[in-house]
Amino acid sequence: MTKNKNKIPKNFLTFEAILKKAKVEKKEIKDLTKIEGKRVANAIKKWAKTKGGVNYTHWFQSLSGRPSEKHDTIEYFSFDNLTQGEPDASSFPNGWLRDTFEARGYTSWDTTSPIFIKTYSGGYKVLCIPTILYSYNGHSLDNKLPLLRSQELINIQSIRLLQALGNVTSKSVVTCVGAEQEFFLIPLDILNKRPDIKLTGRSLFGQPSPRGQEGKDHYFGTMHGDVLKFMVEAENELKPIGVKIETKHNEVAPSQFEFAVRFSTGSIATDQNQLLMETLERVAERHGFACLLHEKPFAGLNGSGKHNNWSLQTDDGIQLFLPGKDKESMDRFLLFVCAVIRGAHKYAGLLRMSAANAGNAHRLGGHEAPPAIISVYLGRVISDLLQKVADSKEISFSKKKSMLDLGNAAVAQIDKHSTDRNRTSPLAFTSNKFEFRMVPSSISIAMVNTILNTIVAEGLDEFATRLIEAESVDSEISSIIKDTLEDHGSIVFNGDNY
């Protein structure tokens, strides 16, 4: 049997895979004994060395917005090195939680995200251990710890609501996140002639492009050879560390492109988006390009965003934002949608803040979607369903699918979705998820998802408490939906946001 030369090396390990290599049967790091911890560290060290790793680093996402790392020799790697590091906390952005003389900070291993081998120029390889950063007093100093806390919060409150609705099989709920990354490519020699772009990431002077996006021919157009070579190489660098590219294509503006990474849990998706941005910038240089992640590099052309597709799923496979086919599943779906409506209306300012930076101020609104005003798109069908339940009217469930007949026997009929896709809406329901379209192209998606998780979890908590205390669950479901529409329904806008 010949060895497959095209097989992609697997340069990442999940926590479960690490425990398996170490022959440890525990499920959580807190349950490990000292002997088991030593076996785990030795298994990681051995694996990293077989992959060519000569150093290790605690890889974390400080408030600077990009990953931070310090490389240490792997020869003295131990369980203590694995689980805890000690960087200078006062040297990172910290909102005055640390003064200059208060330097002690800690990093701790985030076992929800895989460890991976990162390859630098010249083939230099480093074992990267995803970690969180916090101060001597336990204050969070990074983007990851608040995200992990919010994921646990929405897990707890989702299960409370599901149990109040009679679900006894689901044990946990995870956030599923897929980020679409937009960017521009320009030749390096042009960048070197433009100090404004080189220093700020955007053009500050100049003339309008003689050919813009008026022809609408760049979007999904054929990718040119040099660009395609760059995109393929970037994808091939990402595959071994577990970043799976779902799609790549031309975007609307000339020289604008997009990568979309496959859905994963919120914390993993956050790490993978950071790795994607870093890889795009590094690989672009090899191909004679500069990758611009600025939100508005050129006046008169579309800017770049990062659509954050967000949903919830149980451990036994229930998609909580998938419209139901019977009363039980439809009640569940509508309550979770109501939690989003409530959160978006009550905390619109927080949502807007999570997508705010200087670059995005140039992009949002004007002649570019979405506007800078928060609204939620549900579509006519979902909006009508909510109103019917609020009015205690019966919903009819049809097993017959709505099909589109295109009038040609050679073309297959397709299922018609329950809603259109409103690309001008900041927060749009799209079949089985919500798409938050305001996110800046250059930032981490951690804060956005932290806020989404938290504001929705508060609504789930309130709904669960009401159902638990109610004499009639069915009547209370109608009351919750009615109250949500009366108190927060003004945030729903199904029209053209332009």
Describe the role of every protein-language-model region.
Residues 107-294, 298-498:
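Glycine-rich, acidic/polar active-site loops that bind/position phosphate-bearing ligands
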Residues 2-108:
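Active-site core of metal-dependent hydrolases
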